[in-house]
Amino acid sequence: MQLNLKNQSFCLLLSTLLGILCLSIWTLQVLQTSYAAASVSENAGIKKVVILNFDDGRKTQFTQAKPILDNYGYKATFYVVCQYPDNKKGYMNWTELETLHKEGYDIGSHTNNHADLSHASKNSLEYQIGKSKECLEQHGINATSFAYPFDRGWDNKTVVNVVSKYYDLARTASSPVTFLHCDGWVHQSNQTDCRTYTKNGNLNYANRYSIRGWSHDQSRQINSYSDDQLLRRFIQVVNTQNKYNENGTINAIPIVIYHSAGDKDLVDYNTSPILFDEEMKYLHDNNFQVLTMKNLAFDKETNDLFLK
């Protein structure tokens, strides 16, 4: 069968169009592959780290959160109210805390009675801050860091003077990240290092006794987040560091603060084990390095924080 001229022209046109279509598809695939490779390359220099904290010493931190941490091979810092173990329902006992310590978890002080330190007397400060360290030492725990209850006292010179007598570092809240050089607080301070005091003897806004973290449960309480919303916010917070950490250099670290972990009597200040597992899985699947406050230290020569 012979094709007439019109049919030959049509076939030629069809072949040309098919060739262009195939070339376009191939080009699109190449561009997509190149874009994906560029994205991986762009993020390859970002080393992601996160520090996990648990405040108050609730029993569910041991019974619900610890097995999940163990499953992923992660450790965390537990800030303990020293008069609660064996004395207050719903909180860990000393056997559980000593188990955490023996298994490599970090234990810090959260005062003796979860006291508001902002208006405490000097005697009360010594009891809440110094005696809580002594209390932990009696159970074989050398606490090197401290956490302020209610996020209060970190900006009080009298309080900080007592904290600095007993601890290397102290943590408060109110920020998604803490800056290792204390130079990221452009709206609060023009400081370029982490000295505790200014030349005039006043407290610097950021220093090793006001290390900032993000309160996971308070964020839920303030914003009435569902679990899905809180997971999305968690992902945003732990990735806040990306714009500060480039080429493998760590300048900013997110510190995530948890409280309850599945307590049935707490609704809006609580993290369910399901949500906690999802968050730990996200860290695992995205190659985060999970650390404790024990990994954070202060260089007295440069007046900066650094990771050990």
Which residues fall in each region the model found?
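Charged, glycine/proline-rich intrinsically disordered loops and linkers
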Residues: L180-R212, Q221-Y225, L231-N239, K243-N245
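N-terminal Sec-pathway targeting helices
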Residues: Q2-T16
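Catalytic grooves of carbohydrate-active enzymes
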Residues: W214-L291
